[in-house]
A protein has these predicted regions:
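Acyl-donor binding region in acyl/amide transferases
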Residues: 80-162, 279-355
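A conserved beta-strand-loop-helix scaffold within acyl/acetyltransferase catalytic domains
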Residues: 21-63, 71-81, 207-306
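Acyltransferase donor/substrate-recognition loop-hinge adjacent to the catalytic core
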Residues: 148-228
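Short, well-ordered beta-strand micro-motif
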Residues: 60-62, 171-175, 255-257, 366-370
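Generic start-of-chain signal for non-secretory N-termini
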Residues: 1-30
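Conserved acetyl-CoA-binding loop of GNAT-fold acetyltransferases
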Residues: 22, 159-166, 352-363
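Catalytic cores of nucleotide-enabled group-transfer and carboxylate-activating enzymes in metabolic
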Residues: 34-37, 43-44, 52-60, 68-70, ...
Length: 371
């Protein structure tokens, strides 16, 4: 066995990194493949906006012609400049069930970070900054769209190399027909009437685009205190927004307004994981057909953003937000709701959701090592 840095200027080398996960999970009924084109773009410094400010190296462990594992090493300079830190990230970690292969990959990650004069290593996180984590609970459930799935041995393999838990993210389930207490609707009505809260809805993707600058400013305000946050560039913002708009139904995007100011948000989308499985990682020639058909048929919805800005909490606006969520789910006839990756330290959000009888059923993890 040997570990090798890939020459990512070569398409064949990028494909070697990407193809490995399709081989590793090809017989797994719950794994949801990424789009190959998007995965390939992640490695392409000439196409992905991450490389306008930062850099990454990609490694594989090989035995003969066979790939046994892979890992990426990143220095996100935007993150380090924002936090005044010297942090490296590892990402896209995938490995066969062989602890020696995992040790080779993770030791390379440690060596790479030290060689680049960085003193902390966190992962898995990718070039977007919000992508990547390791599933540690809930292996019997298919992941929500864009959320990682992996084999159960990953957690032990990573800890074996000296990493410790950094942060856990919880995903929760609720039945689509769950009823909220009538008093919550009474509170929401009073808050709207007396305190100037309202719901902003969208009728088209173009209308959503017009609101993106305001929404991103609010996003930065709301997230800047989190240790995982960094301000994305305009190009990175476009990258994420364009990916979201490919799949989003505008009627599932809502803003809570306080007079003319954004006070909170609801971001939901149809879970088309089954369609992505049928597409096999390709949009063409028939991938779009499977995805669009599943979007029409699915009775699952993913909630991937739900919250209020700090200054509007405690004013009754949470009643406005959660009743709007319930009404949106009912209007679309969803039977199942997946609340995606809530930071375990976000106690306010967790408490609100537990009041709504959300049951936490999946757990993802980031790991950390300080040198």
């Amino acid at each position: 066995m040997q570990i090798r840095k890939l020459d990512t200027t070569q398409k064949s080398e990028r494909a070697r990194f990407v193809d490995f996960i399709f081989d590793l999970y090809k017989d797994h009924p719950l794994w949801v493949p990424p789009f190959r084109s998007e995965a390939m773009k992640t490695l392409d410094a000439s196409k992905h906006p991450f490389y306008e400010h930062s850099y990454a190296d990609f490694f594989v462990v090989e035995e003969g012609s066979q790939v046994l594992g892979r890992i990426a090493m990143l220095e996100n300079r935007s993150f380090n400049n924002f936090h005044n830190t010297k942090t490296a990230f590892f990402g896209y970690f995938e490995v066969v069930e062989n602890i020696d292969v995992a040790r080779m990959l993770l030791q390379k990650a440690i060596e790479w970070a030290k060689a680049h004069d960085l003193d902390t290593l966190i992962g898995p996180r990718g070039v977007i900054g919000i992508d990547g984590s390791v599933l540690v609970e809930g292996f019997e459930h298919r992941p929500a769209m864009t959320i990682p799935y992996n084999y159960p041995y990953y957690d032990a393999f990573i800890k074996d190399s000296g990493f410790e838990k950094d942060t856990d993210y919880l995903s929760g389930y609720a039945s689509g027909d769950h009823e909220l207490p009538p008093r919550l609707y009474d509170i929401a009505a009073k808050v709207k009437a007396k305190r100037g809260f309202s719901i902003k809805t969208f009728s088209s993707k173009d209308e959503i685009r017009q609101w993106i600058p305001r929404a991103m400013a609010i996003h930065r305000e709301a997230m800047s205190g989190l240790h995982s946050f960094f301000p994305p560039s305009e190009a990175e913002t476009r990258e994420v927004i364009n990916s979201l708009l490919m799949i989003v139904d505008p009627s599932l995007i809502k803003l809570v307004m306080k007079d003319d100011e954004i006070a909170g948000f609801l971001i939901a989308y149809h879970d088309v994981s089954a369609g992505l499985q049928k597409a096999g990682g390709r949009l063409f020639p028939f991938g779009w057909f499977h995805i669009l058909r599943d979007r029409r048929k699915t009775d699952w919805v993913n909630i991937n953003g739900l919250g209020l800005l700090p200054q509007y909490r405690g004013l009754g606006a949470n009643a406005v937000l959660y009743t709007e969520l319930r009404d949106t789910i009912a209007a679309h006839g969803f039977k199942h709701m997946d609340i995606v990756q809530v930071n375990e330290t976000n106690f306010n959000s967790r408490s609100d959701m537990e009041t709504m009888e959300i049951k936490w059923y999946k757990r993802h993890r980031h790991y950390k090592m300080i040198f």
